[in-house]
């Protein structure tokens, strides 16, 4: 096996390890297992919410901020895509029964998240004028 093949094999194994860790992260998030949910974050991780202009620095601050959320939340994963150091998760985050369509962009260093950026959007009613060109998604 040449160096390029070894690198590709390592990359594939690492990607699978990160994907497995992300599956565990989102399952822990949905189960409100705050400790397991945040194991994947680097000590100096940064979490950004561009829509509100907030930035949280440090794994403990991220964990404490999320643990203090007063609403009951649920996570429904639509898809996870990525490779290498960049991973994206699309999910529906439901707070007290109200859905928010969410995109999480995670940047990794090694096997830990060093930066996460999340965007949130409320559902909206599809306009009638587009009906002839679109399919309706039940989710």
Predicted regions, residues:
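Short, low-complexity N-terminal intrinsically disordered segments enriched in polar/charged residues
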Residues: 1-43, 132-139
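A beta-strand edge to alpha-helix "cap/lid" segment located at domain peripheries
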Residues: 2-13, 63-139
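A structural signal for well-ordered alpha-helical scaffolds and beta->alpha junctions
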Residues: 18, 22, 59-62, 99
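Short amphipathic alpha-helical "recognition" segments used for binding
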Residues: 21, 41, 52, 94, ...
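Alpha-helix C-capping/helix-to-loop hinge sites
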Residues: 25-28, 47-48, 90
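Flexible interhelical turns and helix-capping residues at alpha-helix boundaries
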Residues: 30, 45, 95-97
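A solvent-exposed, acidic/Ser-Thr-rich amphipathic alpha-helical stretch
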Residues: 34-84
